[in-house]
């Protein structure tokens, strides 16, 4: 339609991950939509229309630097509210009916820029916990914990991971974990 933002087409990507000398290769289909407020309803419509199995919600450390910066948290709560209530902003009757049954198999909260908020920090405890499950207790996730609990109570499993896309830290491992956990 003229004057409306058109969603980008989904793209296919190959994910390679080596585990104990065994290389696993999976093909995934992904779409990246903008993070501005006026795109939020489009996120939800896109998830339902494409029947997305894994939702990866990417955050960074902005809310730790500036406590008044709550844009990420508002976007997160918007998505969580819709997933828990199954109330999606669909346009057609058919899509509204489809949305009542929609639920993702996995919700992944991924904290990006770990090279900035974790590895450059003076807190040696968290640097030691980089490759452990204890990193899930880091304060970067604190504002998002109530929403993750709501998802869990609604029957939507979720995981928390830390990556640095710029440096390539744990990106493949995180995608592989998502693919493994959704089963």
Name every feature range the model reports, one short phrase each.
Residues 1-27, 40:
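Switch I (effector-binding) loop of TRAFAC-class P-loop GTPase G-domains
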Residues 21-26, 153-159:
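A short helix-to-beta-strand connector/capping loop
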Residues 30-32, 106-112, 159-165:
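Extended hydrophobic secondary-structure segments that form protein cores and membrane-embedded regions
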Residues 33-40:
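Short acidic, Gly/Ser-rich segments with clustered Asp/Glu that frequently serve as metal-coordination loops
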Residues 41-45:
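Alpha-helical scaffolding within the catalytic cores
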């Amino acid at each position: 339609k003229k004057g409306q933002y058109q969603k980008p087409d989904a793209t296919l990507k190959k994910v390679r991950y080596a585990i104990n000398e065994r290389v696993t290769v999976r093909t995934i289909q992904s779409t990246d939509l903008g993070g501005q407020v006026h795109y939020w309803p489009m996120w939800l419509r896109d998830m339902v229309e494409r029947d997305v199995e894994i939702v990866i919600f990417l955050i960074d450390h902005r809310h730790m630097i500036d406590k008044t910066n709550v844009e990420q948290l508002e976007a997160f709560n918007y998505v969580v509210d819709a997933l828990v209530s199954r109330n999606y902003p669909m346009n057609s009757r058919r899509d509204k009916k489809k949305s009542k049954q929609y639920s993702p198999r996995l919700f992944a909260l991924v904290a990006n820029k770990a090279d900035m908020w974790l590895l450059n920090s003076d807190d040696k405890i968290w640097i030691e916990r980089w490759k452990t499950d204890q990193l899930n207790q880091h304060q970067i996730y604190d504002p998002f914990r109530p929403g993750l609990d709501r998802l869990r109570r609604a029957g939507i499993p979720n995981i928390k991971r830390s990556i640095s896309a710029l440096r390539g830290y744990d990106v493949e491992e995180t995608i592989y974990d998502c693919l493994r956990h959704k089963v």
